[in-house]
Amino acid sequence: MIPAPAAGVFTRGRMAEDMTESQGAPYGKPETLVERLDALYEYEREPVTADKLHGWRTFIAMFSSEHIAGTEFVLGTLLVGHGVTAFDVFAGLALGNLLAVLSWALMCAPIAVKERLTVYWQIRKVAGPYLTVLYSGLLALILCLLAGAMVSVSTTAVAKTVGVTSPDYTAGDRIPSVPWIAIAVGVGTVIAVLAVLGFEKLAHFAKVVAPWMPFVFLSGAIASLPTLGVTSLSDFWQVANEKIWTGTAKPGHLQYGFWSCVGLAWLCNISQHMGMGDVTIFRFAKKWQMGFCSAFGMFLGHYMAWICSGIMCAAFEQTELAAGVLKPNPTPANIALLGAGYAGIVCVLLAGWTTANPTLYRAGLAFQVATPNWRRWVVTLVAGVLMIVIACIPAVLHFLDRIVALYGLFFMPLGAFIFIDVWVFPLLGLRKYYAEARRLLISWPAAVGWFGSFGICFALYAKNAQDDFYSLHWINDYLPTRLANYEADVFSQALPAWVLAVTLYTVCSIVQQKLAGPRPAAASEEAPAS
């Protein structure tokens, strides 16, 4: 779901990280928070040189292997529980994933190829070092949460093997059993220790095991179809609407529809494409058109895999109900075992593991800014402890679809600012990278655009939320009738949030730059002193 850097693509950056760890900062020991973060990324502030660029095969392989995670078992199952129709799934996910691919190809990749800088330095130039520090810290927390969700998925595989019942996250179970917690702690500890030992070997292992995972999803779904009564291809659409995606939400689930599917597929990785997180990897691309390689990940991982896991979920529930089980528990391990046997169990275990490891690695790097005297392995281990705690909370999986949506909406504005700075500001006669040019510690237009856009969109969603944010219903008392009656689906907030963010940022930037007088001289290639 959330991709990690591919092995071999970031050799220069990782070599630099090792040098930073063993030798310290290049210009003496950094003391301030900003200097520590700058030192961590010091060797990545220069644009990528031509000899480091990669071709189509690298990016096709990367997206194909890194967007099938253990959480695909969860998200496909949640769509079944939220009562979408077959049309919603097939058409909605197709449109949402197409929008995601176009966002990578037309927004993220062109800027990455033009600037050849990491997202850290892009945000540093636009928003100033203080907001960049905040971005890194909050991103680390979110990455720990996502890694914890992936550990939970792997834990269901181990628990199934040893006969321990997993919490029913689709029913909203909050408290797991003590044996399940013990297994989650054990699985999380193994993942944390392996992440501490090194990233390159783990990334290589992920690239070796990942290619067969799509076949497990596909074969499991095909094998499950007879259980649902599908005897020929002509039966599928009727069965899909009657027994899989029925259009009726299960108790305790919100009703989703076509636009929910579109929004979820688009928002799932919005921090990477519209949020510009993947400029860090596409800066190594020879051409911006390589952004279309994202289609291999989206339509394998977030289309085919979600549909297949939904089919396996429905087949498992029907089998359990036929056996007299009143409350089927469609955990990733349960549905995979029914559809693909023990190959499915292995797939669940590895799909969670191979994605949790690099996610935890990235969280450790982001946390490192606040721990100047700690070695990287200690920071990664601390992040691992947080990951393990989160893995023991089943509610994370129950709300995973909304978590990834809100996470994407929160980080997306910073990417929007980069897009506007690079392409729009020159047309408006404004200075791009103004915070860098003026050596500002914080860009107040970026702060207003970031927190203003997310705050407004979150409030519009939460004020009428049916199950989560009752305490925010009071907002309606202070709104005009039209706004008070407006009900915003969190999955439909991507475009409004982007427009609102760039509008606030652009208007505030015009005020800032016009009040400051003449345009500043162009910033040097070196990042400004803080």
Which stretches of residues belong to each language-model region?
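Membrane-interface loop-to-helix entry segments
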Residues: 187-238, 292-298, 403-416
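Juxtamembrane transmembrane-helix boundary signature
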Residues: 27, 94-127, 135-151, 316, ...
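Membrane-water interface regions at transmembrane-helix termini and the short interhelical loops
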Residues: 80-83, 109-110, 126, 134, ...
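Hydrophobic, membrane-embedded alpha-helices of multi-pass small-molecule transporters
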Residues: 54-73, 224-228, 241-314, 335-357, ...
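Membrane-interface "cap" regions at the ends of multi-pass membrane proteins
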Residues: 12-88, 224, 248-263, 280-290, ...
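Hydrophobic alpha-helical segments and their helix-loop junctions in multi-pass secondary transporters
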Residues: 156-160, 214-246, 263, 270, ...
